[in-house]
Amino acid sequence: MSARDRFFRSLMMAGLFAGVFWVDAALAQGAGCAFAPVAGTSRQILRCQEGLTIIVEGGSRFTLVDRDRNGKVDAVRLRRKALLLDAPAGSIPGGFAVVTPQAIAAARGTKWAVDVARGKTSVFVLRGRVAVNRPASSAGVVLAPGDGVDVEAGTGPLTVKRWPAKRVSALLARFGQ
């Protein structure tokens, strides 16, 4: 790994970027991923080994994570804005997780969106199932297609809701879907 890559990796891991965080293309490739800009938008598509695809909303602040240090991305720390994730069944042994300040959303073989804004994390499932819990709690909920949950700081129970079409459409439009 070059000195430049080590430098950017240390910044990424320490979470020292201010403002908009863009994952360095060389680091993404080192983790088995490649970025592609979406023409005419501020969105990017991150395609990783094993078929994982992440559509990144413009202005998102996130960090790619290799929890088991096998050279493949298996989690994302999301701090701002939203990601639309598609992790085909069996693509990531042990599943894929999105960690936010308010929640952990973990899935296998699914398509889901995670949005962080104004002290709240919202998770919505399009396909498959996603387990959601607060970082400091093992109690959580499991979302099915069409289900969503809004997680705010605190210890109260999480409430699964069927999201109205208007809310789903507004979220997916942010990803060009």
Report residues per predicted region:
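Bacterial N-terminal signal peptides
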Residues: 11-22
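Sec/Tat signal peptide C-region and signal peptidase I cleavage site
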Residues: 22-28
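Flexible, surface-exposed loop/linker segments and immediately adjacent secondary-structure boundaries
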Residues: 29-177
